[in-house]
């Protein structure tokens, strides 16, 4: 029995006169799937074409973001669907965030030189969003595909080279394709829009910083989450708000960089002034959505929320956040070991989380590996790569957190704000003072 699928030329696929044609080609199943023991549902009507759709490139439910492009292709970007109309928006709103993510910023990042200049090609008119999909494009201008000639055959240890082949049977060799951190440009651009919506609508602020590089760990009590500023975070190349520990982290990265090696670390992210009530019980808890979003970033290997694993060493009486009434008559908690979320729903306190990143897998040291044709070999990877990803991961984490929160804000508004709220228990998702200053 034969099945029929439309075919398309892929990089690395076997050449054939049939490839690239618009007609259907027949794929013969192995003999063990003979017609005697393998049956497809019969269709009395004409044969229908099997549709194969790419998966995993779209994020969100109400505020939906699809990223596209590859590390050494023509460019990368995103399409944002579901952005509210009449939001003031220009390329400069996104560029400031893309510049924080941009490669080649310092000696502790990849030396690849890209301006990462973005262009909005749809979804805005006269400086305002129109409610239609917003397309953002960033060209690639500093590709060096020849750096990856050896890696077209030999798999980089702990990289996605092998697993992409295991899944698809074909992959983009140069720069890792979609598995490259360059894919995150689209996320950061969309995250800039999400951060602006959060700030204008509810006054919420998302900030992230580096809290660990290799064995250099910033003590939590050194940073006041209520008052830490973006200026403090951006005051050094490692994006640690404490100058003393920033120097120690930079030294740790320099030590492995000169040896052609790499290290990992931790990014801490906080959210201030987030409305209460975001998130839903059971399967779509707010911390679960945040964990999924952050763990979708390249090189992530761990996620902690609130007290995290340290909470497992406490008793209930030590861990519980006791309630009290503040001077404004609001219910608050005296401590914040819950990390601003209880029962999967935001409680109005500062949200805090930590995301662990592994050492960069592409290093210029000799490693044992195998080739695509299953021969053992040695590999010294070429190319330009970060000795530590965490300084540039800071805006990526902020972007993913902001995307989750805007999506949850829209969900809360549509589900729980349609009818009059219970003023004794619920708070309106009222606009921040900044939104009142926007002239439409």
From Swiss-Prot:
**Keywords on this record?**
Amino-acid biosynthesis, Aromatic amino acid biosynthesis, Chloroplast, Lyase, Plastid, Transit peptide
- Ranges for region Disordered: 100-147
Q: Name one Pfam family in it.
A: Chorismate_synt
Which InterPro entries does the record associate with it? Chorismate_synth (IPR000453), Chorismate_synth_AroC_sf (IPR035904), Chorismate_synthase_CS (IPR020541)
Give GO BP annotations, semicolon-separated: amino acid biosynthetic process; aromatic amino acid family biosynthetic process; chorismate biosynthetic process
Could you say which enzyme class this protein belongs to?
A: lyase
Pathway the protein acts in: Metabolic intermediate biosynthesis; chorismate biosynthesis; chorismate from D-erythrose 4-phosphate and phosphoenolpyruvate: step 7/7
Q: Where is the transit peptide?
A: 1-54
Query: What does the record say about tissue specificity?
Result: Predominantly expressed in flowers and roots and, to a lesser extent, in stems, leaves, and cotyledons.
Q: Name one GO cellular component term.
A: chloroplast
Q: Which GO terms describe its molecular function?
A: chorismate synthase activity; FMN binding
Cofactor(s), by name: FMNH2
The reaction(s) this protein catalyses: 5-O-(1-carboxyvinyl)-3-phosphoshikimate = chorismate + phosphate
What Gene3D superfamilies does this protein's entry cite?
Chorismate synthase AroC (3.60.150.10)
Q: What is its EC number?
A: 4.2.3.5
Compartmental location: Plastid, Chloroplast
- Known PANTHER family for this protein? CHORISMATE SYNTHASE, CHORISMATE SYNTHASE 1, CHLOROPLASTIC
Q: Which family does it belong to?
A: Belongs to the chorismate synthase family.
What does the function comment of this entry state?
Answer: Catalyzes the last common step of the biosynthesis of aromatic amino acids, produced via the shikimic acid pathway.
Protein name per UniProt: Chorismate synthase 1, chloroplastic
The uppermost taxa in this organism's lineage are: Eukaryota, Viridiplantae, Streptophyta, Embryophyta, Tracheophyta
